[in-house]
Amino acid sequence: MNQWVTSEYKNRISATSVSDASVGKTLFLSGWAFRYRDQGGVIFIDLRDRSGILQIVARKEILGDDFSKVEKIRSEFVIAVKGKLSLRDADSINPKMETGKYELIAESVEILNSSKTPPFTLDEFDPSGEEIRLKYRYLDMRREELRDRLVLRHKLTFALREYLDSKSFLEIETPILNKSTPEGARDFLVPSRLNAGEFYALPQSPQLFKQILMIGGMERYFQIVKCFRDEDLRADRQPEFTQLDMEFSFVTEEDIRREIEAMWAFALKKVFQLEVNAPFMTMPYHVAMEEYGSDKPDIRFGMKLVNVSEHVKSCDFQVFTGAITSGGVVKAICVPGGSVISRKEIEDLTAWLSRDYRAKGLAYMKHGANGLESTITKRFSPEALEAIAKAVGSKEGDMVFFGADSSKIVNASLGALRLKLSEKYDPPKVPYSFHWVVDFPMFEIDETTKSWTFLHHPFTSPKEEDFQKLRDWKDGKEVDLSSIGAKAYDLVLNGTEIGGGSIRIHNPEIQSLVLEAIGIGEEDAKSKFGFLLDALSFGAPPHGGIAFGVDRIMMLLTGGTSIRDVIAFPKTQKGTCMMSEAPGPVEAKQLEELKLRVVTI
C-alpha cells in the first residue's frame, strides 16, 4: 500500500458529505467499488461507503500509469481515491442518487484489497433468497436496505438513551448467567465447570434483577439488553433478542404510561420524523378480545367482531343455535366489498381456520340488492336478517362471515380472518397507530396442564380490590381466579405487541399467594425465587416497569417482514446461524471438563 493512502486516512470524508462548497477541492475517499463502467480511456466507478455512493471518474490522461490499476478494479474491490470534486454535466445528472450531481475526478487511485465475485449482486432490488444473504451477511450489510436499517437502529437506541438519561434513569447491567426460573419459555442452559452437574440459565428477561434494583434504591433503571428464549421460532421470534428494559419506583400505572408515551414521541420524531399523538388510546382487555378477537388488535381499520347471538338464537340453523345452547356465541364480521370473494376462496379460508384455529366452519351471507343472501338465509326470519345487517353495518356489495363456537375459538378465528381480509378489502387508514391494552385478568387456565397459570408473569400485581379474593382462595373458599384483575398493560403498534409491563408485587404475602395459586408452593418458591422473596421483606418500594422488543419495533418502523431484517447477525427459524454455522459440536475434552456426555436418545 502506498504511503500516500495511510497519510490521508485522517482526511477521509464520506461519500455523501460532498456539497457545492466542496466543488473544486481535493478530497480523499475510500470504500468499495460498487458499479464499474469502462468506456475506453475513461472508467466510471460508483464508490460506496457506509453513507452512500459517489461517482468516480478515472481518465487515462490524468492518471497516467496509475490508470492500469483502475483497469484491474472489479466489483467489491476495496479502493482509495484522491481527486477534485466536480459538478456533472447537466445531461449526466442522476436525480435518483443523493450525490447525483457530483463526480470526483480521480488524481490518485489505490487498490487496498481485491474481492471474490459476490454470490449475489448487491443492488437493493436483487431478488436473491434470504438463505444465501444470511450465509454472506457481511455482503448483505453492504446493501442499502440493510445498512440503513442498522443505522436507524443505532439512532433509535441512542435517542432512547438520550431521553431516559434526561429523565434521571440509570443504565445498569444485570447478570447474563443466573439460575433457571419459570418465565413462560424454555431456558438456554449453560453447564458450570466449577460446579459439576449444575447449570446457569441465560436470562429470558432481567425481571427479578430489575425489581431488586428498585429494592436497592436505584429508583429508575433501564437497560438495552440481550434476552434468550429456547422456543419454536416464527417470523417475529429469535432465540436471542434485544429488549429496552425499564423499571420505576413510586409510580402508578398511569405514571408509567405517560412517561412511555413521551419517550416514544421524542425518539420517533427525532429518528423517523414521525409525529406521535399522546396520550395513546386505552382499551380494556375484554373489549380487545370481544371486538377484535385479539389482545393486540390492529385498530387502523374496521371489520369489528359483532356478537349476533341475540339475533339468531331463534333461527332454524342448528350450527348457530347449537353453539348458543352449549354456552358459546355467534359473531359476525362485515367485509366491505367482500361479495366478490369466490366460493373457492371461501373454501380455502374455511380449511385454514379449521386447521389453525379449530373453527368448525365458516358461514357467510352476501349483502345483495334485497339484503342478506345465501343458501342458509331461508332458515332466518326477515327480521333476524335485517337485525344482523344493521348490527354489522353491511350494505350492498359487502360480505358477512359468521363464527359459531366457544368464545375463545370464535374470537381467535374471526380475529385472524379479519386481519387476513383487511389487506385487500379494508386496508389501514393510517400508517401507524399506538394504543394501550389494560385491565388484563391475572390468571388463566393452561389448556395443556388444565391448571392455573399467569397471563403476564407471576410478579405482576393483582388489583388491590382483588387481594381479598386471593386470601379467600387461600382459606379454601370458592373463588374464580380468572375474576382477579392484574395491574398490567401492553403497548400495541399496528396489531403487534411491542411492549408489556405491570405494577409489581412489593408485598411478600401477596407474592407468596400468587405463586401458590399457580402451583408453586413455599419450598418450591424458596428454591426458585428465594433471593427475591427475601429482598421483598426488606422494605421493597411500590414499583413497576415495562419492556419493549427493540427488534420488533424496528421491523414495524422500517417496513420489514421479519425481525431478521433489522438484526445484524440473525438466526434462522431453526435457530442456526448460516454464516458461522452455529450451533455446532464441541471437542470431547470440553465435555469432559464439564462432566457431560452426549447420548443418543
Curated annotation (Swiss-Prot):
List of residues binding L-aspartate: 183, 229, 456, 504
Main location: cytoplasm
PROSITE patterns: AA_TRNA_LIGASE_II
Highest taxon listed in the record's lineage: Bacteria
CDD domains the UniProt entry points to: AspRS_core, EcAspRS_like_N
Reactions catalysed according to its record: tRNA(Asp) + L-aspartate + ATP = L-aspartyl-tRNA(Asp) + AMP + diphosphate
Known EC number: 6.1.1.12
Residue segments, region Aspartate: 207-210
Pfam families: GAD, tRNA-synt_2, tRNA_anti-codon
Secreted in keyword set: no
InterPro entries documented for this protein: Aa-tRNA-synt_II (IPR004364), aa-tRNA-synth_II (IPR006195), aa-tRNA-synth_II/BPL/LPL (IPR045864), Asp-tRNA-ligase_1 (IPR004524), Asp-tRNA-ligase_1_N (IPR047089), Asp/Asn-tRNA-synth_IIb (IPR002312), AspRS_core (IPR047090), GAD-like_sf (IPR004115)
Subunit structure: Homodimer.
Similarity section: Belongs to the class-II aminoacyl-tRNA synthetase family. Type 1 subfamily.
PANTHER family assigned: ASPARTATE--TRNA LIGASE, MITOCHONDRIAL, ASPARTYL/LYSYL-TRNA SYNTHETASE
Role of this protein: Catalyzes the attachment of L-aspartate to tRNA(Asp) in a two-step reaction: L-aspartate is first activated by ATP to form Asp-AMP and then transferred to the acceptor end of tRNA(Asp).
Protein name, UniProt field: Aspartate--tRNA ligase
Native source species: Leptospira biflexa serovar Patoc (strain Patoc 1 / ATCC 23582 / Paris)
